[in-house]
Amino acid sequence: MSDYKVKFVDYPAQYKVHKKELDAAWQKVMEGGDFILREDVEKFEKNLAEYVGAKYAVGVNSGTDALMLTLKALGIGFNNEVITSSHTFWATIEAIENLGAKAVLIDSVDGLMVPEEVVPQITQLTRAIIPVHIAGAVCDMEFL
């Protein structure tokens, strides 16, 4: 147990709020064995696509895989550069480098990437920018 007075995320409290619904869903999936490329996944993907207004959605097992598939779909690979914040979870950099690309890190004072820091890092090898929003603050998405 940590000595922190304020928890970053209180998972037990969040679980208690949704316990009945989560437990029922978990039990249904586990008892049916329908959790890998089956009906429940198809329903999830369809519902997610509708929710975000997309034609398709793909369920994956982790945020790392989601980042890797997105970068791969964009054709990013060897000898490419992807700009992102140094204040990110390690999986962001792992996804970039697993495809053979180079992560170009922006080290901002407040953790948010701003045009003045990003523009000088853009080269002919730059293929993407992955913004990282920190503590409820949002990067300048119009610029990015």
Listing of model-derived features with the role each one plays in the protein:
Residues M1-D34, E39:
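N-terminal "arm"/small-domain region of PLP-dependent enzymes with the aminotransferase-like
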Residues K72-L144:
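PLP-dependent aminotransferase-like
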Residues H18, L22, F44, G63, ...:
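Hydrophobic (often cysteine-bearing) scaffold residues that line and stabilize catalytic clefts
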Residues D23, Q27, E45-A49, M68, ...:
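Solvent-exposed, non-membrane alpha-helical residues enriched in polar/charged side chains
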Residues G33-E81, E94-L99, L105:
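Phosphate-binding glycine-rich loop
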